[in-house]
A protein has these predicted regions:
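Residue-level signature of mid-helix packing/kink "hotspots" within the transmembrane helices
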Residues: 22, 50-58, 141-142, 260
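Symmetry-related core transmembrane helices of the 12-TM Major Facilitator Superfamily/SLC fold
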Residues: 159-176
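Paired small-residue
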Residues: 83, 94-102
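Juxtamembrane intracellular "pre-TM" segments in multi-pass secondary transporters
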Residues: 1, 181-221
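Extracytoplasmic gate region of multi-pass secondary transporters
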Residues: 24-25, 215-257
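Cytoplasmic helix-loop-helix junction between adjacent transmembrane helices
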Residues: 99-136
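Helix-breaking motifs and short loop linkers at transmembrane-helix boundaries and internal kinks
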Residues: 36, 68, 89-94, 123
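Conserved MFS/SLC helix-loop-helix module at the cytosolic interface between two early adjacent transmembrane helices
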Residues: 55-91
């Protein structure tokens, strides 16, 4: 049982974390209705969350490489989801922005160490493991708006369900991964140590090459363009649904889920 949880734990945690990230855009119509926000203010909520997560992740990734910080994982997704829950108590636009920033910090804490957890515990099938990890995040993004849609039925206090999900995730992490120390590597990984050593040696040889900044620039442009388009659509799909199509705010969550899926 524990071995199974250790195998599927990282994608589950990724799903939990991205529940919060995906739900934020679905809450925009709720904020517009309750705080009278305009398009610029609505977009700024998502902008703050995304920028903080993007800037902080490389820094926290460096920290994760230098020091063993497995607690980044439960703390990260807990901060993300509790920040979303706390928006139920927000009394001003500035408070929403602050909580959006905090949710971004939580996401930045989670991702680097979670990726390292996959590598440490499942390096013998790293391709499949990272595939499951990515699917978990995509599922969280897609299901987050559906979960957040409950706010339009039950009111803002429904957001505290995100905190309950975070607590369940923490319990799962404590059961499967805490107290393992350096022994968190699977037996199969130990058997594959020689092959891993060969891969590391090969990586060292390849790392002596020169940086291809032209190719890097092209790749950066493609990734940045995709991310900009993704974020813009995530922000304005629910807004356009309630303003142009005159749809119900609760149904805008379904439109966002269809987009994320």
């Amino acid at each position: 049982m524990k071995r199974m949880i250790r195998k599927y734990g990282p994608p589950i945690f990724h799903c939990i974390n991205d529940f919060g990230q995906g739900s934020l855009a679905a809450l925009i119509p709720f904020f517009i209705a309750n705080f009278g926000l305009n398009y610029y203010q609505s977009a700024t909520i998502i902008f703050c969350n995304t920028v903080v997560a993007s800037i902080a992740q490389p820094i926290l990734g460096y920290v994760a490489d230098r020091w063993r910080v497995p607690w980044f994982i439960p703390v990260g997704f807990t901060v993300t989801l509790v920040s979303i829950s706390a928006m139920a108590m927000a009394t001003s636009y500035e408070m929403i922005l602050a909580l959006s920033l905090l949710a971004g910090v939580g996401a930045a804490l989670f991702h680097p160490e979670a990726a390292l957890l996959v590598n440490r515990t499942q390096s013998h099938e790293i391709g499949n493991a990272m595939g499951r990890f990515a699917v978990g995040g995509s599922a969280g993004f897609a299901l987050g708006p559906l979960l957040a849609g409950g706010v339009y039925v039950f009111g803002g206090q429904f957001l505290w369900v995100f905190t309950i999900i975070a607590l369940l995730g923490v319990l799962l992490y404590l059961y499967a991964f805490m107290g393992e120390g350096e022994a968190d590597t699977d037996d199969t990984d130990i058997a594959d140590a020689a092959d891993t050593g060969n891969r590391e040696s090969r990586a060292k040889v390849l790392s002596t090459g020169t940086n291809d900044w032209v190719s890097f620039g092209k790749l950066f442009f493609v990734i940045a363009s995709r991310s900009i388009l993704f974020s813009v659509l995530a922000i304005f799909i629910p807004i356009l649904y309630i303003t142009v199509i005159n749809g119900e705010a609760s149904a805008s969550s379904l439109a966002l889920t269809a987009y994320f899926a």
